[in-house]
Swiss-Prot record:
Transmembrane segments: none annotated. It comes from the Eukaryota. It comes from Takifugu rubripes. InterPro entries: Actin (IPR004000), Actin/actin-like_CS (IPR020902), Actin_CS (IPR004001), ATPase_NBD (IPR043129). Its EC number is 3.6.4.-. One of its GO terms (cellular component) is cytoplasm. Oxidation of Met-44 and Met-47 by MICALs (mical1, mical2 or mical3) to form methionine sulfoxide promotes actin filament depolymerization. Mical1 and mical2 produce the (R)-S-oxide form. The (R)-S-oxide form is reverted by msrb1 and msrb2, which promote actin repolymerization. Methylation at His-73 by SETD3. Methylation stabilizes actin filaments. It is found in: Cytoplasm, Cytoskeleton; Nucleus. This is Actin, cytoplasmic 3. Belongs to the actin family. The keyword Mitochondrion does not apply. Actin is a highly conserved protein that polymerizes to produce filaments that form cross-linked networks in the cytoplasm of cells. Actin exists in both monomeric (G-actin) and polymeric (F-actin) forms, both forms playing key functions, such as cell motility and contraction. In addition to their role in the cytoplasmic cytoskeleton, G- and F-actin also localize in the nucleus, and regulate gene transcription and motility and repair of damaged DNA.
Length: 375
């Protein structure tokens, strides 16, 4: 591998795609992982209407489009749309020729094997990349926090997982996955706002609700007490202006929405909350390393950006763990992008250069090479 060629780092999230160059401290391009197609027939000739739009352009034209996310729960469900997103990433956002740069991609742990094989195939066959690698998202977040041991609770738009890592190795038997993340919280907020009399139904309106969620929601330290405060006074109410100028008021929904992370029963799910999942993940590890995991619990991903989430995690895990245990929740301010930052660090390490899967290796072995070289 030539040193002068910059590697590309692409973190394909269910909600946002983060892309840029290895060695940079932040992604150059961050755009929604959305492909939009017109809902109506184009009647004006020469408008340059396209049959599909990607990312921010799809977002800005959402009023006339049907929006689809090709990645659901961290798994690519629509490869044609995914290819459009990658094409957009390379040619429109980063403005690079993918055949000239090694590409580091990311994926959720416990993904189906076929998913990474197909990613590998598209990179080499459609985009002709000289080399590529697929890394596990949570491991990259830990790199970004400067640790080699810890448990990462990574929660994005599509999937949440807890990954214990010891001396740089992920412990696969103790990885737990929870299909409850940002998109489910957005849907839940749509539902509870509807109960308040505000109707949000279309894919375009869902994006408005996502914005409300990102701007106004927070995690309560004590849910019952917060509910009592909300019902007795209007101190927790906030207003939000919709695109048409209408102003809506939102009260206990602000903390009821993210509370579902701790009480998935709110969404009709039988799974454990993020605090219990983190605890269960630690308990699946060897008794000798648990202390190090409790003391290095790292939050990562956009769904961990709610104010109050770290304090609440601290409180909940302290209640579950042995009473003498030191518990430390690490919530770096840049955690929204820590997967990408970790990828940027990894791809620029000199020791990593022999880890790339080269085009030649791919031609010799086919897509299954990815399981041998990436773990």
């Amino acid at each position: 591998m030539e040193d002068e060629v910059a590697s590309l780092v692409v973190d394909n999230g269910s909600g946002m795609c983060k892309a840029g160059f290895a060695g940079d401290d932040a992604p150059r391009a961050v755009f929604p992982s959305i492909v939009g197609r017109p809902r109506h027939q184009g009647v004006m000739v020469g408008m340059g209407q396209k049959d599909s739009y990607v990312g921010d352009e799809a977002q800005s034209k959402r009023g006339i489009l049907t929006l689809k996310y090709p990645i659901e729960h961290g798994i690519v469900t629509n490869w044609d749309d995914m290819e459009k997103i990658w094409h957009h990433t390379f040619y429109n956002e980063l403005r690079v020729a993918p055949e000239e740069h090694p590409v580091l991609l990311t994926e959720a742990p416990l993904n189906p094997k076929a998913n990474r094989e197909k990613m590998t195939q598209i990179m080499f066959e459609t985009f002709n990349t000289p080399a590529m690698y697929v890394a596990i998202q949570a491991v990259l977040s830990l790199y970004a926090s400067g640790r080699t041991t810890g448990i990462v609770m990574d929660s994005g738009d599509g999937v949440t997982h807890t990954v214990p890592i010891y001396e740089g190795y992920a412990l696969p038997h103790a990885i737990l996955r929870l299909d409850l993340a940002g998109r489910d919280l957005t849907d839940y907020l749509m539902k509870i706002l509807t109960e308040r009399g505000y109707s949000f139904t279309t894919t375009a309106e869902r994006e408005i609700v996502r914005d409300i969620k990102e701007k106004l929601c927070y995690v309560a330290l004590d849910f019952e007490q917060e509910m009592a405060t909300a019902s007795s006074s209007s101190s927790l109410e906030k207003s939000y202006e919709l695109p048409d100028g209408q102003v809506i008021t939102i009260g206990n929904e602000r903390f009821r929405c993210p509370e579902a992370l701790f009480q998935p029963s709110f969404l009709g799910m039988e799974s454990s909350g993020i605090h219990e999942t983190t605890y269960n993940s630690i308990m699946k590890c060897d008794v000798d390393i648990r202390k190090d995991l409790y003391a290095n619990t790292v939050l990562s991903g956009g769904t961990t950006m709610y104010p109050g989430i770290a304090d609440r995690m601290q409180k909940e895990i302290t209640a579950l763990a042995p009473s003498t245990m030191k518990i430390k929740i690490i919530a770096p301010p840049e955690r929204k992008y820590s997967v990408w930052i970790g990828g940027s660090i990894l791809a620029s390490l000199s020791t990593f250069q022999q880890m790339w899967i080269s085009k030649q290796e791919y031609d010799e072995s086919g897509p299954s090479i990815v399981h041998r070289k990436c773990f």
